[in-house]
Amino acid sequence: MESRQDITNQEELWKMKPRKNLEDDYLNEDSRENSMPKRPMLVHLHQTAHFDEFDCPPELQHKQELFPKWHLPIKIAAIVSSLTFLYTLLREVIHPFVTSHQQYFYKIPILVINKVLPMVSITLLALVYLPGVIAAIVQLHNGTKYKKFPHWLDRWMVTRKQFGLLSFFFAVLHAVYSLSYPMRRSYRYKLLNWAYQQVQQNKEDAWIEHDVWRMEIYVSLGIVTLAILALLAVTSIPSVSDSLTWREFHYIQSTLGIVSLLLGTIHALIFAWNKWVDIKQFIWYTPPTFMIAVFLPTVVLICKVILLLPCLRRKILKIRHGWEDVTKINKTEMSSQL
């Protein structure tokens, strides 16, 4: 969802223009650089892209790709979801069945799935901002912004919006599944069992202070994170993004996006609370899901902090405004000649 328009040469002229005009400027600049009649072709594509099935010829319908920018994000989401589901199933269901013959298969529809959803959501959100970090490192290494990114990185950056929308989708599902917990019959039976055990132990109060604080904090952070993700999703709608200036759009998608990733990571860390040092959490010598979930977001956040250091930040901004490191460019040219 993060915009790549901040690496162009005319950034200072575009800050107060609507995003639709920015896209037109990009098209005009491409036409000037390549001296090719791209505008008629783009107009033709624009005219055919929005026809319905009654207006568009059948042969043209078959030639058009179906959601081309969604292929990579959906594949990644499917892979992460499948691996997380199998991993959680092994720990939550298979392990107790093998070791103590306890049948917890009823956990699969809600509890297991609800451990998969936040893992996929925060991973996809980290994948939105990881290519920006890699792009900054590549530009620092090359000393210029005019050298093309690798094809895989360029494709990744183009699909960041789709990664972000999928992250929001899984976050909404996670919230809905969490709200359904009290409606489950198994939860009601467990609640009765807990009350009976409290009576048997002659406990008048089952209040656990630190556990109450843990839940209050991580639920609050989860709500705020979901609200920010909703804002990011709304601003990615073309009709909304076209009404924003470049600076407004960049602030929402970049700054608030990183804030949502930070809050989501803290949400997962507080959910874990003191489970990090609990040996019982390491079933079959495997770490719990939340440990794996926060790894990639933590790496992205640390890299973002490092790139915000003044010595690196100033150089990145200079490169993105057109400055070139002559020493690195000369070394690259010499190595290419050899």
Swiss-Prot record:
FAD binds at Q139, R160, S236, Q253. It is found in: Endosome membrane; Cell membrane. GO terms for cellular component: endosome; endosome membrane; plasma membrane. Keywords: Cell membrane, Endosome, FAD, Flavoprotein, Heme, Iron, Membrane, Metal-binding, Transmembrane, Transmembrane helix. Its cofactor is FAD; heme b. The chain crosses the membrane at residues 70-90, 118-138, 163-183, 217-237, 252-272, 290-310. It is a multi-pass membrane protein. Heme b binds at H174, H267. It comes from the Eukaryota. Residues 117-264 form the Ferric oxidoreductase domain. Belongs to the STEAP family. Does not function as a metalloreductase due to the absence of binding sites for the electron-donating substrate NADPH. This is STEAP1 protein. It comes from Sus scrofa. The lineage of its organism: Eukaryota, Metazoa, Chordata, Craniata, Vertebrata. The gene is STEAP1.
